[in-house]
Curated annotation (Swiss-Prot):
Principal place of residence: membrane
Organism: Salmonella typhimurium (strain LT2 / SGSC1412 / ATCC 700720)
Record-given protein name: Uncharacterized lipoprotein YceB
GO cellular component, one term: plasma membrane
Keyword check for Membrane: yes
Gene encoding the protein: yceB
Record lineage: Bacteria, Pseudomonadati, Pseudomonadota, Gammaproteobacteria, Enterobacterales
Compartmental location: Cell membrane
């Protein structure tokens, strides 16, 4: 009798898991990180040309979904900074921590990271910290513009049945720790 109940429980749990795939599609942090690695080409010149300008290249972006703050994505990454000013040229590396709000565009089947902002930044060499503080508003504006225009993840109909279904039936997104869930029903 116990074996029967155990078998029945296995069948029911299998059905529930199978039905779950019919009601939602889940994108993991790892999938977002892979997409960011492929798509991130942030390279920007900011500042006042001729007086002080900086070329910034963002690399090694890694996401944490909904872990630090509900409904937000936290990104960490590196940035190379080449600074030219009236005082000469300098190079630096930065460690950045960014926060953004993931937003789903149903028409494009894409997740964008909007309201992007730098929440923490350290620079090496340390003597460049004051320069970084001066550039931060420009960097925030550039990052916000870049990520508002370029999706972090795009659903593809040719990738998998679940992803194709998500692109057709998506009703928005839900941010959960470690994943973004795309429900097919309200």
């Amino acid at each position: 009798m116990k074996k029967f109940f155990f078998a029945a429980a296995l069948v029911v749990s299998g059905l529930l898991v199978g039905c779950n795939q019919l009601t939602q599609y889940t994108i993991s942090e790892q999938e977002i990180n892979q997409a960011l690695e492929k798509r991130n080409n942030f390279s920007k010149d900011i500042g006042l040309p001729g007086i002080a300008d900086a070329h910034i290249v963002l690399t090694n972006l890694v996401s944490q979904i909904g872990r630090e703050e509900p409904n937000k994505v936290t990104l960490t990454g590196d940035a190379r900074l080449d600074m030219n000013s009236l005082f000469g040229s300098q190079k630096a590396t930065m460690k950045l921590k960014l926060k953004a709000l993931p937003v789903f565009d149903k028409e494009k089947g894409a997740i964008y990271l909007q309201e992007m902002e730098v929440v923490d930044a350290t620079v090496t060499p340390e003597k460049m910290q004051s320069v970084l503080q001066t550039l931060l508003p420009y960097l925030n504006q550039s990052l916000r513009s870049y990520f508002n225009q370029r999706p972090a993840y795009v659903l593809r109909e040719d990738s998998s049945k679940g992803e194709a279904l998500a692109k057709k039936l998506a009703k928005g997104i839900e941010v959960k720790p470690g994943e973004i869930v795309i429900p097919f029903t309200n």
